[in-house]
């Protein structure tokens, strides 16, 4: 079976969804920009040699509809002979895109693929056009479709206090800002055109979503966002709304070496699981355990973790049940996470994987694990091994 390697991984800056940098930039343009950039950074691979493009996106309507993967590829002037498909596993869409490409390469059906994802939550809101079947209520609580209430449920089940959530959220912003200031994101962010507050066109090379002034004291003043009576989850301890895209160049190890391209990491294992929709945020626990089992590893073997921060109330139970509470500051989301950077749904899987690869190199660790929860009760995880 072919070994699957990541040759390169990049992303756009994360733009604020409400009146942010990309308010006049379409999702297809963000995607096409990264497709062009990946190919330009790796000229040894001719675009025509790509076997397929796998692109994650959740809200596949309006500018993100009608197979945005193909639309973006055409905008990027990728040869017409290269196919493209849009992948949707809700929050796990772009990680699923990676898994799909990896399996094609493992089986010998492909040698090179471009994977990634996008979500412009400012142009196409998360709830746009959603219409759940009323019959679902026979099997699933209505609140299971309300992500904030599923986070409240996890907080109550696992004893995650308001104070713990506020502290974790403040940490996310502090670490993301420190990473920005130190240049830790420079190897992954591709400068991207947008508009500043005055409407002037400029190149953005930083995440505008981060709030460096965030403190535990300020977060403590916010009202509960989803359960006004007894809730603990606030807007400040939830992932920010942002616009962005991320992309990775995935190849068989043999083809990469044949072209003289240096692999950055191997895909060691992949896993997807289902869980109770009422606690959808718990999905990373069984997904990570399954991915570790497939890799023949344990959590203690993993040098760094990237766990998508849908909510502080959601990620803390996952950290606890993976036995990592005492290692948060050594292993978990060392450059902050979605609470600070935002969670553009179709982008996040590739985004956290990209950040993880850079952290693995910076920390000089062999293994890294990226995982995320998925709305309606799923989890997805990938174990990477440095080459």
Swiss-Prot record:
HAMAP family assigned: FadA (MF_01620)
Q: Which domain of life is it from?
A: Bacteria
According to its record, what are the GO cellular component terms?
cytoplasm
Q: Which Pfam families match?
A: Thiolase_C (PF02803), Thiolase_N (PF00108)
What's this chain's function? Answer: Catalyzes the final step of fatty acid oxidation in which acetyl-CoA is released and the CoA ester of a fatty acid two carbons shorter is formed.
Q: Which GO terms describe its biological process?
A: fatty acid beta-oxidation; phenylacetate catabolic process
Q: Oligomeric state and partners? A: Heterotetramer of two alpha chains (FadB) and two beta chains (FadA).
The similarity comment for this entry is: Belongs to the thiolase-like superfamily. Thiolase family.
User: Single GO molecular-function term?
Assistant: acetyl-CoA C-acyltransferase activity
Named in its record, the pathway it takes part in is: Lipid metabolism; fatty acid beta-oxidation
Enzyme class, spelled out: transferase
**What positions constitute the catalytic site?**
91, 343, 373
**Record InterPro entries:** FadA, Thiolase, Thiolase-like, Thiolase-like_sf_Thiolase, Thiolase_acyl_enz_int_AS, Thiolase_AS, Thiolase_C, Thiolase_CS
Xref: PANTHER family = 3-KETOACYL-COA THIOLASE FADA, 3-KETOACYL-COA THIOLASE, PEROXISOMAL
Q: Answer yes or no on keyword Acyltransferase.
A: yes
Query: What catalytic reaction does the record list?
Result: an acyl-CoA + acetyl-CoA = a 3-oxoacyl-CoA + CoA
Q: What protein name is recorded for this chain?
A: 3-ketoacyl-CoA thiolase
Q: What is its EC number?
A: 2.3.1.16
Q: Which UniProt keywords apply?
A: Acyltransferase, Cytoplasm, Fatty acid metabolism, Lipid degradation, Lipid metabolism, Transferase
Locations listed in the record: Cytoplasm
